[in-house]
Structures are given as structure tokens and as C-alpha cells.
Design a protein with these regions (language model features):
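Hydrophobic, Leu/Ile/Phe/Ala-enriched alpha-helical segments that form helix-helix packing faces
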Residues: 46, 147-150, 154, 199-203, ...
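GST-like fold's C-terminal all-alpha helical module
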Residues: 79-189
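Extended hydrophobic/aromatic segments used for targeting, binding, or gating
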Residues: 167-223
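Generic alpha-helical structural signal
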Residues: 68, 144-148, 197
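Short alpha-helical hairpin
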Residues: 17, 121-122, 220
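Short secondary-structure transition/capping segments
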Residues: 50-64, 103-114, 131-133, 202-216
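GST-like domain detector, emphasizing the conserved glutathione-binding G-site
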Residues: 1-107
């Protein structure tokens, strides 16, 4: 499917999102006069426009309801983990934010002009996400149990197939982002959940080791 990608700087979606695609969060999409917000809504619409290959099991397949529930969990719960951690990391090292901007991103201003705004942007992201050091640390502490659930779904054949389904894309994108945080990476590496990143291109940015306090750092994943 042909498309045009529009890159937005962090927080600017609050200003331009309503006019462009009808919301203040990302992702958003505009198809003609139709405006859609949110990954699940967008994937359902894309499935309607391009039915094959489908992102969901057939309607008569009992696995369909399970995949939809896993997708919901990934969107509403697992996705909150990087949302809690990344702003606190960026506050500590604002310059790290620039590493997540690939060479193919169309910025409205030269990078040198944007750099002075990075510390403020990081703090605004934390306010927007309602995250504190305590919530970030708690999110890391709860991640192993969440990864256990993902590993179990892979073992049951609901995730990790040869062709990704909607839940693979929802959860795999979050896993990929979490693995870009070097202090969190060891918690995921070696798990079946880590293999869900294969559906995506390599991550551009990285939060280097030592950005988060040492007492937050997770224990290595099980062998």
C-alpha cells in the first residue's frame, strides 16, 4: 500500500495532530477525508483496505479473540512500560533523544537548532506521560512478569508465527523499543519475546548503559 510518512517532533502532535489526523497522540493516519488515531484502530482499517494477508485469524478461528485480547493488552498495558522509562532516561541525558532520529527523518529545523530544546522536551514528555522516577522503577520491576506472559503466548502459538499478526506487531514494537534501553536490554535478551523484534527493522536510537540509576537495573534474563 502506497503512503506518505509525516514525521513529528516529540510533543508537537498536541498542536498539529487534531488538524492532520484528528487526535493528539501518535500514530495517526489520514485516508482521504478519513482520520484515524491509535494503532489498533489503524490496523483494523488497513485490514479492511488490504484483506490479504490478514493481521487476524479468520472470524471462525477461536484464536481470533485471543489475539485481539493480546493486542489490547500490548496497547493498554505493555506499551506503558517504555512510556514510563524513556522520559526519565531523557531527563538524565537529553542528548540521547537525538539518537532516535534517523537520517531519513524530515525535521522542520536543523538539528543544531533543536538541541537546546531537548531538556525541556524531555520534561514535557514526562509530564505528558505522568511518569516519575518511582513509576519508571516500578515499571522495570514489573517487566519480568509481563515478559513471562509474552513468552507463554509464543509457546501457545498465538505470537511469533512466520507471518506476524496484529498482536505480534503491537507487542513486538514495544519490545524493540525496550531493548534499545541498554539498562533494560538484559532483562529481555535471550527470551522468546526478544524474537518478536524480527518483524521490524533495527532500532535507530539507543539509551546507553548507565543512564538509569544502578539500583534500577534489572537482573539478566533467564537462560
Amino acid at each position: 500500500m502506497a503512503f506518505d510518512r509525516v514525521d513529528l517532533l516529540p510533543m508537537t502532535q498536541l498542536l498539529v495532530g487534531p488538524a492532520r489526523y484528528g487526535g493528539t497522540t501518535v500514530p495517526g493516519i489520514r485516508i482521504g477525508g478519513e482520520r484515524l488515531v491509535g494503532s489498533r484502530t489503524i490496523m483494523r482499517r488497513l485490514d479492511e483496505l488490504t484483506p490479504e494477508p490478514s493481521l487476524l485469524p479468520a472470524p471462525e478461528d477461536p484464536a481470533r479473540a485471543q489475539v485481539l485480547e493480546i493486542e489490547r493488552w500490548g496497547d493498554e498495558e505493555l506499551q506503558d512500560v517504555p512510556r514510563a522509562i524513556l522520559p526519565r532516561a531523557f531527563i538524565r541525558k537529553p542528548a540521547v533523544m537525538e539518537s532516535f532520529v534517523g537520517d531519513d527523518v524530515n525535521l522542520p529545523l536543523p538539528r543544531a537548532m533543536l538541541r537546546p530544546s531537548l531538556p525541556l522536551t524531555a520534561r514535557l514528555m514526562a509530564i505528558r506521560s505522568k511518569t516519575t522516577d518511582e513509576t519508571a522503577r516500578a515499571s522495570i520491576a514489573g517487566l519480568p512478569e509481563q515478559l513471562d506472559r509474552v513468552d507463554a503466548w509464543i509457546a501457545d502459538g498465538l505470537l511469533g508465527g512466520d507471518r506476524p499478526n496484529a498482536a505480534d506487531l503491537q507487542i513486538g514494537s514495544t519490545i524493540r523499543l525496550l531493548m534499545a534501553i541498554a539498562d533494560v536490554h538484559p532483562l529481555i535478551a535471550g527470551r522468546p519475546a526478544a524474537k518478536l523484534t524480527r518483524y521490524f527493522p533495527p532500532m535507530v536510537g539507543e539509551v546507553p548503559a548507565g543512564t538509569l540509576p544502578a539500583e534500577w537495573q534489572p537482573a539478566p534474563a533467564r537462560g
